[in-house]
Amino acid sequence: MLAFLGGTGPEGRGLALRLALAGERVVIGSRDAERAGKVAEDLLQQVPGGRIEGAANADAAARADVVFLTFPYEGQRALLEQLQEPLIGKVVVNVIA
C-alpha cells in the first residue's frame, strides 16, 4: 500500500490518482481523517474499482509500505517526529522541494 501524507492537497491527490489508475492500492492521509475520506471518495469516482482509502496521517503511515510526504516542508519536521514509530522500516519519499 502507498500512503500520501497531506494527501488532500494537489500534489497528494494527483500522485494518488495516477498510481491508483495504475492499479496501486493507496491511502490518503490527512490531519483530518474525515477530510481524507472525502478526498478518497472523490478520487474513487475517477478510478472505478480503484483501491483508495482515507485515514488520519498516523494510520496511513502505519498501514503503508511506501509513504509519500506531500505537504509543505515547513510542517514536515513536526509530523515526522510524531510518526517516528510508524515510519520505521518504510520507504519515505519527499515530493516537496
Model regions: which residues?
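Rossmann-like NAD(P)-binding element
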Residues: 46-51, 55-92
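Glycine-/Pro-rich loop/turn segments that contact NAD(P) or position catalytic residues
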Residues: 93-97
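NAD(P)+-binding Rossmann beta1-loop-alpha1 motif at the extreme N-terminus of oxidoreductases
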Residues: 1-42
